[in-house]
């Protein structure tokens, strides 16, 4: 593209052109360009900015002049008139393109027509100056802390400072208002803090106005993946081991209650979404979230989202969770428990509904303190309804790369009648030196030996069969990784096949692919 060549001529040192940034993973020194699409290229540099960040420079086609854009907008408004725009975003884009094609035929422009169309659609339909970051699949998070540069977290290079910059409050406020309106949750001075979803599904938090955000309005975007990360990808990334995944598979087969816990940005929702593929296919699932992130492969899936109106029409997680109990679900999945809906979740467990959720807690002690304290206030006698607590964290490896690891999986057994403490057993622990998940092995799982064995009618002499089954499930998942079966829905299909054929036959089948 000519605009990329124009950019390159202004550089003192020509960067390397690469197809995939992953080839530079672990590199301390880099200067490269990669393509996002025909109109967006990214130049990444290890040259530190004054605030210590590596550089992320967006390369886009030049914009038409301000006067040209004003004229185009006026003509567009006249052309579209009172036409009702289509609901579907892609159909809207088609309509805009067809109108612009006619308008631009009769205009003399300072830039090529396709550049004008790109910028018009980028600004009017999508996310404006942030759109290149939304389109880049290697970005995890986007942060506008106020006036100044936009920052990102890159999947390969970690935190970076972008070339996108806001220099006045009006420009920044206009973006925040525009994006919140496109998210159908508009900000205002009466409602300055809003959680919403962008048109592509990414989760966004808006804080509007200099009166509450001293450096100007701010936003944080957590990028959304259209196809969820699969359990085999998490095994390949090292987030969890195949044995740990096999253990979770076994537990979800038996309707166990499970929380995925960790700090912010530790990958809790990603893991929760990945393990939903282990829930038996013939069960009814209800997902309850503030912003829609969970994607469940099951056909009998009810997806519910809260509604914030600031008045009587507000629907909170608490309301949806109470309603879900009347919908006869087999599994209830809550995007994140943080308030009194946690109490309802434990009542659901008490009445025989299986529940999974994410939760902010770094360890079992913090988990219990938060669950039993204000505002959740779960009675301690209810805590053992939660069978499994999985703890995940984000950390840096020896090369300085950001990685995510499940560092402990605890089985919650009971409440000690003397000390009133929660009794639990760590089923898996993490060895940070070897970067390995350690399974305590045969005889170590209370849930396998005292719940699953009893449920299946297996006597204590034959409990070893359940551990053998764990090994087979682990082997099956390892084979999927070896065969590079990573697509979320493909993995789901192979798990269904294993259910139909039996594990032994499924292992033979995958081995011969």
UniProtKB/Swiss-Prot annotation:
Its cofactor is Mn(2+); Ca(2+); Mg(2+). Transmembrane segments: none annotated. Mg(2+) binds at residue 269. ADP binds at residues 239, 265, 267-270. It holds the Pfam family T2SSE. Belongs to the GSP E family. Contains a variable N-terminal domain (NTD) and a conserved C-terminal ATPase domain (CTD), connected by a flexible linker. Both NTD and CTD form similarly sized globular structures. The NTD is essential for archaellum formation, motility and FlaI localization, but not for ATPase activity. ATP binding induces a conformational change and locks the hexamer into a more symmetrical and less dynamic conformation, which may promote hexamer assembly by stabilizing interactions across adjacent subunits. This is Archaeal flagellar ATPase motor FlaI. The gene is flaI.
């Amino acid at each position: 593209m000519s605009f990329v060549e124009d950019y390159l001529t202004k550089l003192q040192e020509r960067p390397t052109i690469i197809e995939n940034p992953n080839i530079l993973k672990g590199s301390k020194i880099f200067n490269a360009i990669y393509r996002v699409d025909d109109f967006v290229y990214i130049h990444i540099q290890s040259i530190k900015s004054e605030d210590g960040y590596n550089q992320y420079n967006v390369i886009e086609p030049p914009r038409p002049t301000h006067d040209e854009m004003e004229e185009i907008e006026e003509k567009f408004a006249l052309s579209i008139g009172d036409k009702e725009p289509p609901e579907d975003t892609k159909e809207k884009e088609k309509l805009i393109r067809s109108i612009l094609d006619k308008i631009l035929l009769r205009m003399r422009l300072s830039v090529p027509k396709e550049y004008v169309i790109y910028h018009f659609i980028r600004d009017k339909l999508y996310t404006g100056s942030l759109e290149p970051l939304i389109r880049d699949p290697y970005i995890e998070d986007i942060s506008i802390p106020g006036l100044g540069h936009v920052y990102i977290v890159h999947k390969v290079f970690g935190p970076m400072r972008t070339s996108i910059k806001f220099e006045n409050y009006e420009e920044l406020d206009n973006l925040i208002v525009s994006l919140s309106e496109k998210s159908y949750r508009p900000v205002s001075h009466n409602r300055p803090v809003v959680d919403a979803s962008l048109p592509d599904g990414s989760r966004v938090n808006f804080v509007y106005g200099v009166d509450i955000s001293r450096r100007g309005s701010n936003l944080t975007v957590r990028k959304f993946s259209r196809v969820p990360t699969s359990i085999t990808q998490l095994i390949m990334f090292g987030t969890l081991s195949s044995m740990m995944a096999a253990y979770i598979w076994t537990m979800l087969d038996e309707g166990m209650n499970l929380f995925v816990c960790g700090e912010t940005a530790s990958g809790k929702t990603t893991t929760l979404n990945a393990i939903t593929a282990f829930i038996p296919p013939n069960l009814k699932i209800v997902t309850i979230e503030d912003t829609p992130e969970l994607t469940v492969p099951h056909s009998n899936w009810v997806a519910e989202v809260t509604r914030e109106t600031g008045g009587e029409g507000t629907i909170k997680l608490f309301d949806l969770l109470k309603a879900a109990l009347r919908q006869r679900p087999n599994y209830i999945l809550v995007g994140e428990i943080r308030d009194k809906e946690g109490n309802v979740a434990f009542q659901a467990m008490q009445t025989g509904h299986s529940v999974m959720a994410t939760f902010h807690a770094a360890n079992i002690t913090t988990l219990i303190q938060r669950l039993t304290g204000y505002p959740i206030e779960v009675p301690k006698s209810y805590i053992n309804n939660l069978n499994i607590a999985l703890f995940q964290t984000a950390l840096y490896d020896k090369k300085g790369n950001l990685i995510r690891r499940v560092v402990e999986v605890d089985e919650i057994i009971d409440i000690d009648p003397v000390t009133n403490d929660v009794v639990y057993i760590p089923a898996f622990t993490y060895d940070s030196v070897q970067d390995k998940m350690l399974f305590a092995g045969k005889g170590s799982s209370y849930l396998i030996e005292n719940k699953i064995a009893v449920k299946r009618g297996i006597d204590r002499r034959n409990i070893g069969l359940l551990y053998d089954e764990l090994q087979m499930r682990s082997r099956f998942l390892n084979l999927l990784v070896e065969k590079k079966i990573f697509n979320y829905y493909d993995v789901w299909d192979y798990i269904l096949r294993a259910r139909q054929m039996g594990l032994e036959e499924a292992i033979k089948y995958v081995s011969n692919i």
